[in-house]
């Protein structure tokens, strides 16, 4: 048997089987390890699921708790709301009329008390009011928004002195004049009998520019200026404007215009030339002469010329003072208004604007001192004007112009050199001047009747013919235009014709009457084109109407009075006898 051959084939199969067995064992071992790992993962997942389930149960419990708390909060809020409504009803029931009126001074927010100086009750918040002259610190009703309470307002206090409402303001109070505005915002006010007081501004006046002479209402209990009052007393007599009248708009006053330009335009527009020659600009101009001769228009043209010819192109201001309306029965009021007028002029002049102060009807304000019959108001008004005019010396852009047809009544101190330096007589126009004035009113824009245009050959020729014939009718010294016979103290008689009473205003009135007559005839003709326009007959009719008006006026006036107001320059008159309208 030892020598029997080995079966190699069987041996190889055994080794192969053992190898496969080992691989199977290894695979089994790996499977068991994988199974163990999966078992551990399963256990971990089961534990995580258990944790999630526990958290879910806890969340459900918290949700249920929150729902219970929410229900309790809703119930509590409803109960609180009902309690607040009840408290408001009780508070409204407690605060019932009557209420007391008071003026609110200030509102205080709560703050920490200063130890050793004030107690907690002082700084809890509240408001300061003035009631019947007493200053009180009161509480503000919790139903009010304290931030909306404005100092100076009228408030209502209940029986416990708590502010329960705001009352509408009355706007009334003592009326005082501003004398000076202080740097800290306070105001120095002037009252009656030279009384002065310093007051604070109410919130409504914060930032408002107040000038000297402005009127304000004052609550004397709190010493506050409440509001500015726009009084018309000064504005009615003072027209602050920039005139649009030029010298070219004025006819028949060539010599007077030349004198005004020499006296005003040159020193105001070329002050350096005047200074080089040792001259100063005139402080004022006096325009005098009969009524209706263009004195006011000249003053307006001066203001316009100062602005139109200024090197800087700045505008000017024309302060037109209506003299009679400036007079006031209260002592010192007229003087105060004169100061206000010059203060306004200084404001504009300080800003670099040329200013013209024009006093119309100057004799009504500044008549000769001591000439009054029932009172001597001029004894204080005239010195006030003289003081203001002398004060104008330091200003470069102010000139005073006075106009009057009774220059004999004005105080001589006003007219002396150094005050109203330049005196210009504005006399009645002659025939050439009247034609020039009429051309300013009967312009190319005014329609002329077709018959007159056809007869003259052109509209311009017809206009010239109408003006020439109308002026000839006005200045005719025949028997038909004689109005009265004047006798002077020497016994000399003078025939008074319509030509002696013609003024720029009369010429303008003639043209206006003719225009109205033309409109009347045009409408009466059913607005037929052939009836349109002014014709010679309308102008002659207007001259006749003016002649009748002058006749009626002369028949009712005394000779001496007529001589003073009409510009009569002959001897003193003794009598005036009407020759027109007197039946034989």
Swiss-Prot record:
Keywords: ATP-binding, Coiled coil, Nucleotide-binding. Pfam families: AAA, Prot_ATP_ID_OB_C, Prot_ATP_ID_OB_N. GO terms for biological process: modification-dependent protein catabolic process; proteasomal protein catabolic process. One of its GO terms (molecular function) is ATP hydrolysis activity. ATP binds at residues 292-297. InterPro entries: AAA+_ATPase, AAA_ATPase_domain, ATPase_AAA_core, ATPase_AAA_CS, NA-bd_OB-fold, P-loop_NTPase, Prot_ATP_ID_OB_2nd, Prot_ATP_ID_OB_N. Residues 10-96 form a coiled coil. GO terms for cellular component: proteasome complex. Residues 40-66 are annotated as: Disordered. Gene3D superfamilies: 1.10.8.60, 1.20.5.170, Nucleic acid-binding proteins, P-loop containing nucleotide triphosphate hydrolases. Belongs to the AAA ATPase family. Homohexamer. Assembles into a hexameric ring structure. This is AAA ATPase forming ring-shaped complexes. The lineage of its organism: Bacteria, Bacillati, Actinomycetota, Actinomycetes, Micrococcales. The gene is arc.
């Amino acid at each position: 048997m030892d020598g029997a051959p080995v079966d190699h084939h069987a041996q190889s199969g055994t080794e192969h089987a053992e190898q496969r067995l080992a691989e199977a064992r290894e695979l089994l071992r790996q499977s068991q390890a994988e199974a163990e790992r999966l078992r551990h993962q399963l256990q971990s997942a089961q534990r995580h699921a258990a944790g999630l389930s526990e958290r879910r149960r806890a969340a459900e419990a918290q949700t249920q708790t929150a729902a219970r708390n929410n229900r309790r909060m809703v119930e509590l809020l409803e109960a609180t709301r009902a309690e607040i409504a009840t408290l408001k009803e009780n508070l409204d029931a407690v605060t019932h009329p009557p209420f007391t009126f008071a003026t609110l001074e200030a509102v205080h927010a709560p703050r920490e008390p200063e130890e050793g100086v004030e107690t907690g009750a002082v700084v809890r918040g509240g408001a300061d009011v003035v009631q019947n002259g007493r200053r009180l610190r009161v509480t503000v009703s919790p139903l009010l928004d304290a931030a909306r309470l404005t100092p100076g307002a009228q408030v209502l206090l209940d029986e416990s002195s708590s502010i329960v409402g705001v009352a509408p303001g009355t706007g009334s109070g003592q009326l005082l004049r501003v004398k000076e505005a202080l740097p800290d915002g306070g105001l120095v006010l002037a009252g009656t009998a030279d009384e002065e007081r310093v007051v604070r501004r109410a919130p409504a006046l914060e930032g408002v520019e107040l000038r000297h002479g402005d009127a304000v209402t004052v609550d004397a209990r709190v010493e506050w200026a409440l509001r500015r009052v726009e009084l018309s007393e000064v504005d009615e007599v003072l027209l602050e404007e920039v005139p649009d009248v030029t010298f070219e708009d004025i006819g028949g006053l060539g010599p007077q215009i030349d004198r005004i330009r020499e006296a005003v335009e040159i020193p105001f527009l070329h002050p350096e030339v005047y200074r080089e020659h040792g001259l100063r600009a005139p402080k004022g101009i006096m325009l005098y002469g009969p009524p209706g001769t263009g004195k006011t228009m000249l003053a307006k043209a001066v203001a316009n010329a100062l602005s139109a010819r200024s090197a800087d192109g700045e505008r000017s201001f024309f302060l037109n003072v209506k003299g009679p309306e400036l007079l006031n029965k209260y002592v010192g009021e007229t003087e105060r208004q004169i100061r206000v007028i010059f203060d306004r002029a200084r404001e504009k002049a300080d800003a670099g604007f040329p200013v013209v102060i024009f006093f119309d009807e100057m004799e009504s304000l500044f008549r000769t001192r001591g000439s009054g019959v029932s009172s001597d108001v001029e004894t204080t008004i005239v010195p006030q004007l003289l003081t203001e005019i002398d004060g104008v010396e330091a200003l470069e852009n102010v000139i005073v112009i006075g106009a009057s047809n009774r220059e004999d009544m004005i105080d001589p101190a006003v007219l002396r050199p150094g005050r109203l330096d330049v005196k210009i007589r504005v006399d009645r126009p002659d025939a050439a001047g009247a034609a020039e004035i009429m051309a300013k009113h009967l312009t190319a824009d005014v329609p002329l009747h077709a018959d007159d245009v056809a007869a003259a050959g052109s509209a311009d020729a017809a206009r010239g013919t109408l003006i020439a014939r109308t002026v000839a009718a006005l200045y005719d010294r025949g028997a038909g235009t004689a109005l009265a016979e004047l006798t002077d103290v020497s016994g000399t008689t003078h025939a008074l014709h319509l030509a002696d009473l013609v003024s720029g205003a009369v010429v303008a009135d003639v043209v206006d009457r003719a225009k109205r007559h033309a409109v009347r005839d045009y409408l009466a003709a059913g607005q037929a084109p052939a009836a349109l326009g002014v014709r010679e007959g309308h102008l002659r009719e207007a001259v006749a109407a003016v002649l009748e008006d002058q006749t009626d006026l002369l028949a009712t006036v005394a000779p001496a009075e007529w001589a003073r107001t009409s510009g009569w320059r002959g001897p003193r008159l003794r009598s005036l006898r009407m020759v027109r309208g007197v039946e034989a």
